[in-house]
Amino acid sequence: MRQEKDAGKGGKNMRVYNFSAGPAVLPEEVLMEAAAEMLDYKGTGMSVMEMSHRSKAYQNIIDEAEADLRELMQIPDNYKVLFLQGGSSQQFAMIPMNLMKNGVADYIITGQWARKAWQEAKLYGKANAIASSEDATYSYIPNCADLPISEDADYVYICENNTIYGTKFWQLPNTKGKALVSDVSSCFLSEPVDVSQYGVIYGGVQKNIGPAGVVIAIIREDLISDECLPGTPTMLKYKTHADNGSMYNTPPAYGIYICGKVFKWLKAQGGLAAMKAYNEKKAKILYDFLDESKLFKGTVVKKDRSLMNVPFITGNQDLDAKFVKEAEAAGFVNLKGHRSVGGMRASIYNAMPMEGVEKLVAFMKEFEENNI
């Protein structure tokens, strides 16, 4: 079920349907544009990979990327957009280093990444786990309507979409006036959001926006200051990057360039509202099949299902392994579940075409008929 694409000059490329959780599928239009500009970006005679980040040409690239992101997300003027490095995992430390003024924070534990963030925060202050879904292998989102928010908490932390377990916060927690910090790595730009409800929104781009190596952090300005925890390195202060337009040091220049192209692609698709509608249709195809299947079943409470990451199992580990192997041979790759949970997982990010999900479901139906 591989997609044969014209590679130019009579050549053909065989493209697979890539269901990887990250790094993940990117829009083909973006990849083709980048390929066309690889040796000569807009008459500069060089690749963006070779370009000085201090050049006017590159300044235009990063400025345009930020402007397009602000337009897509309708980011208020009192929020800074930072293009950072270090992966989302580095934010597990940067957040408490920069925000723990009272030395207290509340965490909602809905998966491995929220748990790791909580464990890291405990190195810097009192980090409270105020709700968790660990009791059911993170298969649901806890009720967050009336949480025991700490009176002196500096912030409340969530991982909004849980890549491994396939759950999503469809309603933000009531933080009782405390700043909400949200890791949106695997749902970034998949739907409209009201940025003003957050203190910090951040995420690694390698799932839904661009290549690995870039982290985007959107931070309310009142949370950015020199008053960080004692000993916070210069490079781990948000103010360092905010004061220098994300170019205190050399940024992940090529990654930001690709992100900028994805922002333009999203605008051409109709923006985030159109993207959410498209993602809902894709996810419905897969979830409807799982709900009716006699072999496969989903692992998440229905009301908390993610549109981006869909875990499923057969209930037999050998059969799971057989499915993953045969799917890969048919051109459906990276369907193996996270090493910590097993089973399968289809990550159907923005750039996954409807056709990819439809053909995956057709393959699953055929596999079911042959193995039930």
Predicted regions and their residues:
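Conserved active-site segment immediately N-terminal to the catalytic lysine
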Residues: 181, 195-206, 215
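PLP-dependent aminotransferase-like
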Residues: 89-156
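A glycine-/small-polar-enriched, mobile loop at the entrance of the PLP active site in fold-type I
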Residues: 15-66
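Conserved PLP-binding catalytic core of the aspartate aminotransferase-like
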Residues: 296-327
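Conserved N-terminal alpha-helix of the aminotransferase class I/II PLP-enzyme fold
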Residues: 45-91, 98, 112, 120
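Active-site phosphate-binding strand-loop segment of PLP-dependent enzymes
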Residues: 22, 121, 132-188
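Active-site C-terminal subdomain of aminotransferase-like
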Residues: 27, 205-287, 301, 370-372
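PLP-dependent enzyme catalytic core of the Aspartate aminotransferase-like
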Residues: 13-16, 329, 342-372
